[in-house]
């Protein structure tokens, strides 16, 4: 399940994922939020917390993540992935060189540093 997080500027898509993440999470939560931010801002930022209760992601959701990332590819200014899930951290680090903006992975213990970084000028 994915939910939106409060306390971030409008250009930051701030989400938290836990349990099993589905295509419906992307279609009903993530994609509408990205589209709304993209209508108002030239550049976008993403803050994505993946909780300790993360139980996996459906292949269709992974595809939606990839697709929406590519659709707005040039607009991603910063991406912060906050996770202790090793394979997610490795995947983000492996693909970050493809992103035009800055991408960082933070452990869950550094959430506050990740939040500060994603909102910094």
Provide a role label for each language-model segment:
Residues 2-121:
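Amphipathic, Lys/Arg-enriched alpha-helical "gate/interface" segment within cytosolic domains
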């Amino acid at each position: 399940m994915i939910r939106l997080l409060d306390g971030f500027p409008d250009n930051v898509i701030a989400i938290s994922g836990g349990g099993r993440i589905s295509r419906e999470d992307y279609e009903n939560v993530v994609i509408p939020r990205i589209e709304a931010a993209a209508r108002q801002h030239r550049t976008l930022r993403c803050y994505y917390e993946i909780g300790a209760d993360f139980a996996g992601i459906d292949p269709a959701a992974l595809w939606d993540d990839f697709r929406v990332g590519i659709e707005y590819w040039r607009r991603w200014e910063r991406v912060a992935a906050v996770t202790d899930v090793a394979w997610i951290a490795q995947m983000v680090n492996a693909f970050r060189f493809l992103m035009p903006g800055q991408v960082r992975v933070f452990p869950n213990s550094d959430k506050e540093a990740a939040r500060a970084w994603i909102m910094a000028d």
